[in-house]
Amino acid sequence: MDVNPTLLFLKVPAQNAISTTFPYTGDPPYSHGTGTGYTMDTVNRTHQYSEKGKWTTNTETGAAQLNPIDGPLPEDNEPSGYAQTDCVLEAMAFLEESHPGIFENSCLETMEVVQQTRVDRLTQGRQTYDWTLNRNQPAATALANTIEVFRSNGLIANESGRLIDFLKDVIESMDKEEMEITTHFQRKRRVRDNMTKKMVTQRTIGKKKQRVNKRSYLIRALTLNTMTKDAERGKLKRRAIATPGMQIRGFVYFVETLARSICEKLEQSGLPVGGNEKKAKLANVVRKMMTNSQDTELSFTITGDNTKWNENQNPRMFLAMITYITKNQPEWFRNILSIAPIMFSNKMARLGKGYMFESKRMKLRTQIPAEMLASIDLKYFNESTRKKIEKIRPLLIDGTASLSPGMMMGMFNMLSTVLGVSILNLGQKKYTKTTYWWDGLQSSDDFALIVNAPNHEGIQAGVDRFYRTCKLVGINMSKKKSYINRTGTFEFTSFFYRYGFVANFSMELPSFGVSGINESADMSIGVTVIKNNMINNDLGPATAQMALQLFIKDYRYTYRCHRGDTQIQTRRSFELKKLWEQTRSKAGLLVSDGGPNLYNIRNLHIPEVCLKWELMDEDYQGRLCNPLNPFVSHKEIESVNNAVVMPAHGPAKSMEYDAVATTHSWIPKRNRSILNTSQRGILEDEQMYQKCCNLFEKFFPSSSYRRPVGISSMVEAMVSRARIDARIDFESGRIKKEEFSEIMKICSTIEELRRQK
């Protein structure tokens, strides 16, 4: 049946159809190859925006650095990073005047956090630049490697387990004349295989000690590794993002804690809240502006876009802000917070893997690593790449580029929001001292500006003043990409406002479908996504019912588990038909075992196993929920699991779903090909780390987990816990005397082994 698409929209207000214009169906674009070109673009652009600044040379690393602060104010509309220190400080002072005690209180809250945070806070987060191996690693491994190197170099403050003590080690490490690190390498030998008598290449992984002098260590400590941002929709060009190393992360965390605490107290801030809470906050600001614009006043809203927000921000400005925010605070606290911006003023951007060359004629491929870009003959490159390399050469050191101005993506979201809000705050009548006034919303680089004035000239004047005020602190509102409307219709962080927020359902589209974790989790996540969208995103009952049917269909095709009485032939159908015929109560079979679907929009909150439990044959129940079933490598599952769902914009969200452990909750095994590479040593470290943590959790289940007081190693803690538990179990008669004495013997043996070591 052909549907004329325009008919669909006859009854729909235009703003509700906004969803259909979003590029959110189908697979998002991914990047291939190296990010070197994108990173060079970022570095070159950042320097271009600040080109009239002062050049200096870093005395420790020898890197050329550009400082645009208090530079000449722009005379045109081009983006620029010449923030004026006194203007930023004044904006902070006015922000404090409008919110008495805000900085003071946030500092007190942060001080408490600083003293209590444990170093394991840094294990959160995904990829982290590991300076010991000069490449990216999972955060936990990178942290473990850093601590291991610190300890072998006599830096042991971190043993207390507090993050602030680890950071003391970081500061101390920068004064050391040299650091000794352990790196992984691989050797190849040709040997004859006994079985096949063929020659094979054998790879062995070794660890070797290496000394790094002060300059090289500092460069590594200040390095941000770069990657290409994947899965960005609606853009033709890819762009680079940064992953900082462990030395920087802890300091950034404390600065962002302070800034988050400030943002929570600012009504114009779109961070750190999200979802419905954010919508409520925004609706309040709009309501305020609309009620205050009496019949005599006009009210207009700009859906704002800033040009290259990160590349025009400056760490030196952030240092000024922190200095102001923490005035009158203890010296140690001010110092610890000022280190992050100082490190960022001296940061180095790692250029990534370099370029790949291939000769069509000779069928040869060769990689030019980033380290060689400083010296290689440029005749091999095309015009645009040649220009990039020529421009970046004065900044290169050891395959990294000095990048003093600018903030890489996503590092100081909260603090830059505070800066943005401080300009919105200046729109009050008592500051503008004229007939126009403004207010708005800020969330990282995204903003909406509401201007009220008696007439159109006033609105224009207000917008101009806002634009120029922003320029003074290095914020560049884009005149091309921002647009103005009567208040009541605007967009902010992909929320569309039309006398209230319109559900932008298209953004949720990517998270519908089968996740591909395992049969049990996928069923649960699928129905939870539909349930959540009925609650939050105007997914109506009829559409939800259709979504559910499509999901079940998709699920059956993915896992080849069509109903037992279907005609569809797959490689599972023989087994599933047999099961169908043997089962008395067919309604009790799970969908993944060829059973019928019992879900409808009323019971989406119930896990499938619970929904069908009463309908199941007894022997099926026994097979399904049997931890001793030998065919399943079974993990213990808490009642709630977390899935990562991909909404269309912003980072992957974590979504909770109910997990019932069954024989369908399998875990796929790790791909073996990694075991033959140089990553293998790293993998083994990681597995050992994992095993230790799992063992520790067995001794300290989360319900009884108290943070260890005093300093004891994991082993000591587990041994003493084992002794206490054994005694309680023995005295209450849960274990026999022989078992009790055996446990005690094992504990003593472990302690003995530790002493010998």
Curated annotation (Swiss-Prot):
The name on file for this protein is RNA-directed RNA polymerase catalytic subunit
Indicate the quaternary assembly.
Influenza RNA polymerase is composed of three subunits: PB1, PB2 and PA. Interacts (via N-terminus) with PA (via C-terminus). Interacts (via C-terminus) with PB2 (via N-terminus); this interaction is essential for transcription initiation.
UniProt feature, compositional bias: Polar residues = 55-64
Q: Which GO terms describe its biological process?
A: DNA-templated transcription; symbiont-mediated suppression of host gene expression; symbiont-mediated suppression of host mRNA transcription via inhibition of RNA polymerase II activity; viral RNA genome replication; viral transcription
Q: How is it modified after translation?
A: Phosphorylated by host PRKCA.
- The UniProt entry annotates the motif Nuclear localization signal at 187-195, 203-216
- Tree of life domain: Viruses
Per the UniProt entry, what species is this protein from, by scientific name? Answer: Influenza A virus (strain A/Victoria/3/1975 H3N2)
Q: Tell where it localizes.
A: Host nucleus; Host cytoplasm
Q: What is its EC number?
A: 2.7.7.48
Tell me a GO cellular component.
Answer: host cell nucleus
> What are the boundaries of the region Promoter-binding site?
249-256
